[in-house]
Amino acid sequence: MGCSASKDTTNSKDGAASKGGKDGKTTADRKVAWERIRCAIPRDKDAESKSRRIELFKRFDTNGTGKLSFREVLDGCYSILKLDEFTTHLPDIVQRAFDKAKDLGNKVKGVGEEDLVEFLEFRLMLCYIYDIFELTVMFDTMDKDGSLLLELQEFKEALPKWKEWGVDITDATTVFNEIDTNGSGVVTFDEFSCWAVTKKLQVCGDPDGEGAAKTTADRKVAWERIRCAIPRDKDAESKSRRIELFKQFDTNGTGKLGFREVLDGCYSILKLDEFTTHLPDIVQRAFDKAKDLGNKVKGVGEEDLVEFLEFRLMLCYIYDIFELTVMFDTMDKDGSLLLELQEFKEALKKWKEWGVDITDATTVFNEIDTNGSGVVTFDEFSCWAVTKKLQVCGDPDGEENGANEGN
């Protein structure tokens, strides 16, 4: 897309119109294809979407390495998702999304040049693909002659559409010149997409912004149920419930729980997956913390099991991590599992509810961002949150000697 290209507006618009569009597709064809694509890309955070995403990743991963190259992603977008039904620019779209997800993954992991996307970045990449597709819809709506360059007149003719997209433009020429950053007199897709993202033109590749009220209400109901379901207290009734729960978890009858038994119990008995799609990660963190503390107390080295003495502590850790997840997800609007400074600032009112009055958000954000990557991971957030005691009271007695269940 050269910025110096010129347009023959006399003939090219008529030619595009006679074909029904720049790639031979009519508007109706493209709408049908777009609706199918919206359903085909599993971007949501619910359990069903995650299950579809796991299966899709396996199908994309033709080499079986657990990491996807650009070629594997592009082939999958053609042969499995069939995204080429919508656009002739699929390689460009996939390349943009692949690079953004890969670069962010490398930045967080501290890796330099790894040219692969792992499962942790896969959802983010799908969100980017969706975003770029949706921006393509907007751009194509205005780009009547299919030259991949917008002229001022085309921009002005699309003003009624801008209101639908969430922007009320009063001075089209000024805005057009703002978008045309290199002053060429035409707007490229790159220039348009950079500007559109800053204006948040209802481009919500991560659908958590859509219907967020319903999601929040559902999560509140689930969270209240989970608060009651995890018997963390030291009173007689809670201990009795804990003994019964341990027996239900202990399907092998050994008096010790492996990680698989704990995870299965959290799914089938406590039903903690109603609240989050990250249950395996949460349980793994809690299991490891309780197990390691138990081994330290007992003087055992590597036993990979949790006994009843550590069971209450493990439940407390699960509760802690769930509550931290609530906090993190409240701020992480785009679902990338990374917090940006702007997201952190937008949550300042919430911080007061969580027990911290922040006056200098940038300084605190940089304090949390211990590796200086410019984004905050959940690990960084949770480590900092625990030091601030953000009303995260997994162990309701404030004690970490929960390995002693004899109390």
UniProtKB/Swiss-Prot annotation:
Keywords: Calcium, Cell projection, Cilium, Flagellum, Metal-binding, Repeat. Ca(2+) 1 binds at D61, N63, T65, K67, E72. CDD domains: EFh (cd00051). The keyword Hydrolase does not apply. SUPFAM superfamilies: EF-hand. Its main location: other. Changing E85G: In strain: M110. Ca(2+) 4 binds at D250, N252, T254, K256, E261. Belongs to the calflagin family. May contribute to the rapid motility of the trypanosomes, playing a role either in flagellar structure or in calcium metabolism. Could alternate between a GDP-bound inactive form to a calcium/GTP-bound active form. This is Flagellar calcium-binding protein TB-44A.
